[in-house]
A protein has these predicted regions:
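Terminal amphipathic alpha-helical/low-complexity segments used for targeting or macromolecular assembly
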Residues: 1-173, 180, 259
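Structural signal for interior beta-strand "rungs" in well-ordered beta-sheet cores
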Residues: 162-262
Length: 262
């Protein structure tokens, strides 16, 4: 399988301040980061083309065969199928914006040096569904659908454990619990979308979750919290009170029960 390189473009400016410290593809939408989604779909490790001051941490690694992918694009099964069928020097476009290109090392080196390189065969993506982050509001607006897509992807590789019997659950077959999660005396309603509970996460007594919802590894949902659909609680977060259609990135806390987020 070709190497993966995820690149930033002008969309980065619309995702500030979050992209001051990371490439676009390191944003979490749904359960996984955009980079992680591509790595799982293409079974390869990704590297980055981003701003110079981030390159020390997020460097580039290229090979003789590379998928050059827009870092704000979320892979869908339909898009991934087309990507796997690409030939060298083909490029998929949407409204003249580059989505994916397949480049050899020589072409990629010329691109990075801003040298002239061989023309690519541009193919407009018409009727191919996929999600794309164009502005900050897309992170939560598209989050519910991204959770659904990630669950379909993770089901292929994970063995989830059964929800403990002390909880009240609706649509239990749409509740996905990683090993090591602690859930006791909670209310989980997955009739409108899946609920994902990550490894070592803790959902305390009286918490209410209405899917689609994702609780990241090591996160804590406090007693009596109300987590509504379209919400991701990131790794190591602590969440309390009422949270609606929101994305809490790693190590963010919302403990107050008096104020609503979302």
């Amino acid at each position: 399988m070709p190497n993966i390189i995820l690149f930033d473009n002008d969309v980065r400016e619309k995702l500030l301040p979050l992209t001051f410290t990371r490439p676009n593809c390191e944003l979490r939408v749904g359960i996984l980061r955009i980079r992680e989604k591509w790595e799982k779909h293409l079974n390869a490790t990704a590297s980055f083309i981003t701003h110079d001051y981030l390159a020390g941490k997020y460097g580039i690694d290229y090979d003789d065969d590379n998928f050059f992918i827009n870092g704000s694009v979320l892979p869908s099964p339909e898009l991934v199928t087309l990507v796997k069928q690409m030939d060298y020097n083909e490029a998929f476009l949407q409204n003249d914006e580059l989505i994916v290109a397949r480049l050899d090392a020589r072409q990629l080196e010329r691109l990075m040096k801003d040298d002239a390189f061989e023309a690519l065969k541009g193919i407009e993506l018409e009727g191919t569904p996929f999600l794309k982050i164009n502005q900050l509001t897309d992170l939560y607006r598209l989050n519910g659908e991204a959770i659904r897509q990630d669950i379909e992807l993770l089901q292929k590789e994970r063995n989830f454990v059964e929800l403990p019997g002390s909880n009240f659950a609706k649509a239990k077959d749409q509740i996905f619990v990683e090993e090591g999660a602690e859930i006791s005396g909670a209310y989980l309603n997955a009739t409108e979308g899946p609920i994902y509970i990550g490894a070592q996460a803790k959902v305390m007594e009286g918490a209410m979750l209405r899917g689609p919802v994702a609780i990241g590894d090591h996160a804590t949902v406090r007693m009596g919290a109300k987590i509504y659909g379209g919400t991701t609680i990131g790794r190591w977060c602590k969440a309390g009170g009422e949270i609606v259609e929101s994305v809490l990135l790693e190590y963010a806390n919302k403990r107050s029960e008096e104020r609503r987020v979302g």
